[in-house]
């Protein structure tokens, strides 16, 4: 919600050249929710400053939402499609890398903050540099 009201947000200048890492957490939200928040970023002009967007693979199963394989695949596709559509409304060329195992997915990779990242879109590779 903070992206829509402006509370606790970084200054625009702090976003120049930043790689944005996002994930939907364990809530298993409907696809429109992350899309809505990303539109808030877009309306602020952030996708003109951000260098790339990396999206964690959405968690698609929880004890109270025991989705089968088909339901999980459908949910993840809806999430991916909505994220791309939302970002592309504001920046048609920014690299969007999706379905990485970080955040609240299973399995998950820990990502250290404060380092650098090298993204090669031609080789389709990502390297964390500490």
Set out the residue ranges of the language-model regions.
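Accessory alpha-helical/coil subdomains and C-terminal extensions
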Residues: 1-33
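C-terminal active-site/capping subdomain that shapes the small-molecule cofactor and substrate pocket
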Residues: 31-130
């Amino acid at each position: 919600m903070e992206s829509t009201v402006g509370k606790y947000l970084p200054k625009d200048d702090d976003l120049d050249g930043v790689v944005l890492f996002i994930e939907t957490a364990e809530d298993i939200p409907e696809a429109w929710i992350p899309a809505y928040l990303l539109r808030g970023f877009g309306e602020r002009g952030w996708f003109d400053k951000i260098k790339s967007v990396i999206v964690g693979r959405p968690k698609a199963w929880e004890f109270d939402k025991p989705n089968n394989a088909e339901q999980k695949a459908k949910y993840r596709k809806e999430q991916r499609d909505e994220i791309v559509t939302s970002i592309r409304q504001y920046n048609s060329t920014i690299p969007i890398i999706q379905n990485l195992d970080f955040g609240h997915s299973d399995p998950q990779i820990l990502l250290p903050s404060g380092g650098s990242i090298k993204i090669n879109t031609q080789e389709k590779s990502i390297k964390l540099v500490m």
